[in-house]
Amino acid sequence: MPRAAKRSPGYRVQNRKHKRKPCKDCVAQGLPLTRDAKYPGPRCATHHREFRTARSSTSWETRILATYGITGDEYWQIYEFQGGRCYICQRANGKKKRLSVDHDHKTGIVRGLLCTMCNKYTLGWARDCIEFFKRAIEYLLNPPAVQVIGERIAPVEADKLSRT
């Protein structure tokens, strides 16, 4: 007799419906016991999602308090003060991913909230060097190529410019 025939039905194929318990949050709220808690947790999908969100927010608040010394309420005050956007690019609004807390690495002072691109690649790459940004402003206002060869439109951009 093959070994597979001797075994009992696999764990996954057993009917576990009888083992499911009602959601503990539904029971606590007095809701009808129609929603089962999915294995392995004690909550239905709706309450499990709420629990995960609450746990995520709590751990985030604990982390920013330990790392930057600001509370979740102070974070949201800064967020509102900045108009709900990254202070530098004004594009990112922190809805999909929370804005990063930016701080001065030399003094430790919290400066504001920035998107990942501005915090990591703009300020991080420049290493908080003010001269870097002065050169960048000068570069945008007075490009060196224009000084040397005059205004010349790149062929890749010529088609776009002629259509407008």
From Swiss-Prot:
Coiled coil feature spans: none
InterPro entries: Endonuclease_7 (IPR004211), Endonuclease_7_sf (IPR038563), His-Me_finger_sf (IPR044925)
Pfam families to which the protein is assigned, alphabetical: Endonuclease_7
Domain of life of the native organism: Viruses
SUPFAM superfamilies named in the record: His-Me finger endonucleases (SSF54060)
Name the UniProt record assigns to this protein: Gene 59 protein
